[in-house]
C-alpha cells in the first residue's frame, strides 16, 4: 500500500514540474556573490630606481627626519673593514635599540646601558658619555635612540629622559625627564625634538633649552613595543605614530592637529595581531605618508587630507623603503616584499628564515628593515647574515657574514655601511 502511495506522489511531482513555465534568462554578465569585495589590484613590475647619490649623513632611522633618503651609493659587495666595541650589547634584561647615526664623519652609538660613543671613520673613539643617573640606573632599563641636527645629538633613554649632547665633544647641554618611558629614538628637526612615550603621548621639546613646547595624546591606548615607531618630520608637519594604531598629523611649532587616521585591523591567529602599535615608522615621501602596524596593516595616507590612498593586509616592522615606483617592506610575518607604491599591489615576496630549527619552532630569528643602496637591497638579520637581493626580482644574490648577528638597521654614508651587532660592536663594511 505504501509503495503505491510513494509512486503516486512521485508522478504528481513530475506532473507539476512539467507544467511550470520556462525560466526567462536575463542577459548580462554573471558575478559571483561569494567573491571578495576587494577587487584585484594590478602591480607594475617595471622598476625605475632613484638615481644613486653619495650621502654624507644618516641623521635618523632610515636616514633622515622624514625617514626617507634617496638612493645611497655603495659599490660592489661590501666586506668588513673594522669593528669596535661600543659598550654593553644585548643582555637578558637589556637590549640594544638604537641604530647608528652618522654626521660630519662621526658615527654615534648608544649601548644598552645608556653609554653614548662617537667614532671616527677609522673606528677610533672620539669621545664617550655615560648617561646613567638615579633616573636611569645601570643594568635595569634599556631602550631609546639617537638623532642628529645642528651639531648636536639628541638621545632618548628607556628611563624617560631626553638628553642633548654637543656632537663634537659629548658634553651634556641639557637633560629633561618626560615622566614616562621612551623605547624609540627621538626625531630632531628645525630646533625641535619630538619623542613618543610609552603612555601614548608625544612631547615636543625646544632644542635650545629642553623645555616642553607642546604635547599630544592618542584618543585610544595600546601596548607598546621596544623600538616602536618614531615621529616623521617634513617642514612644519609632524606625523606621530601611537601604540594604539593611530597616526596623527600636527604642526611642529604648535602641536595643532591637522588630521587623524587609525590603521585598524589585526593578524588573525597571531599573538602579535593584538599589538596595534605603529611599528613601521611613518615615512614621508612627497604628498604621501606610509605607515604600518605590528598587527598586519600597512597604509598609504594623503598628507594633506589624512585620507587613505590604499591599505594592505600586511604589517610592517620598521620603516618602509621607497624608491620611485617601488616600496620595499619587512612585514610582521618576516617576509620581504616589494609593492607597487601607487596602489600597494604585490610584485614579489621572499620568506626570510624565522627559526633556527623550523620543525620545532625554536631559536627564533629577527630581521631589520630593508635598505636600498648601490642598486641592491640589503636586509640584516640576527642569524649572523646580511642578505643581498635584486630589488627588481627579489632574487637572493649574496650572503654577507655578520659576526654576532644584527642588533640594528643598516646605516649608510660615504659609500660605507655600518651596523651594530648583538655583541655590542659597531661594524663597518665597504
Predicted regions span which residues?
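Short loop/turn segments that connect beta-strands within beta-propeller blades
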Residues: 120-124, 166-169, 206-210, 252-255, ...
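Short coil/turn segments that connect the beta-strands within blades of beta-propeller domains
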Residues: 55-56, 104-105, 150-151, 190-191, ...
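Extracytoplasmic beta-rich repeat domains
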Residues: 82-101, 128-147, 174-189, 212-234, ...
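Structural signature of WD-repeat beta-propellers
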Residues: 111-112, 150, 157-158, 197-198, ...
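Loop/turn-rich, solvent-exposed surfaces of beta-rich toroidal or solenoidal domains
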Residues: 328-341, 345-388
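Bacterial signal peptide processing site
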Residues: 19-22
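Blade/loop signatures of beta-propeller domains
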Residues: 27-38, 45-81
